[in-house]
């Protein structure tokens, strides 16, 4: 039995542990997650932090226990219901339903354990496990799931907006994210051509003036792309180039109205499940992050790191232009670009620099050098 997974299952399951060990051995070097976890195929006698209860659709008692996990009173519990072609993860008072693209692999639970051992949260690990097929670990080359046709889809989503969102260039280049219209004008004057205005806490009249000024600044440069963070209604009124929304905005924003207005749409994502959610809407670009720790914005998701960003890029690069964001400065920029993204958003590397003009020149030169060498 694989010693690495000896305590990964309840009740103990030698065959699952062996299969998980074989799969994990082919997934490469990943730091193990700090949080404890265990996959429970039956209700444990002594529940522990990190337990993930797994029940089949035919197990009525198990389904009742799994459904209870969706209640806000069970914020730390996780349960997964599954049948031949679907799975539902219950956690933190929420229900996440996934329809598989093919019948679940016999080894999907072992694959789930292997991906959790790589440090992925149960929801993202479940997405990968549903894309896994029996025997993938025996194939030559890299067995990591990357084929979008094999990935599950999120069940119950409405159809993507029609018409589709206007497209963006595949490489958006250096992408400063700045707090006001003065900064928009500065970075455009220094040669940046993709910029995002992210105003926080401004009263309505000031907010509208800032957005109008930022859009007007962009119009002075025929190749400028000014995105507005969050405030899509004002962005549409001002005929902005585009808008950037977070995952939380997908439940409230009128995406069809944004598409009809001709705005480009950028969406944030912090893992495989959120990539599936964002890509369903066919956005103009997809943001991946945070790459590193950042103090410029409160982000629930932990830093993803370069290895994950590279995996995300291999999965999503054929479906949308990609922007990496979060804690990126000049020193790390070449390594971030090497992950396969076509753009990197920067915040404090510009707005916190002692000489923002020099910082922008250095960042742009780094971009040009990296892309020229590809």
Model-predicted regions and their roles:
Residues 118-121, 136-140, 193, 198-200, ...:
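Glycine-rich phosphate-binding active-site loops on the catalytic face of alpha/beta enzymes
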Residues 53-100:
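Conserved phosphate-donor
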Residues 1-49, 58, 123-170, 369:
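Charged C-terminal helix
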Residues 51, 74-77, 189-194, 237-243, ...:
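Glycine-enriched alpha-helix->loop->beta-strand junction motifs that scaffold or abut catalytic
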Residues 40, 53-54, 67, 170-178, ...:
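Hydrophobic faces of well-ordered beta-strands that scaffold small-molecule active sites
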Residues 208-230, 247, 255-270, 301-330, ...:
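Alpha-helix-loop-beta-strand connector modules within alpha/beta enzyme cores
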Residues 226-241, 270-284, 314-323, 328-346, ...:
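Catalytic cores of alpha/beta
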Residues 101-122, 126:
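Short, small-residue alpha-helix embedded
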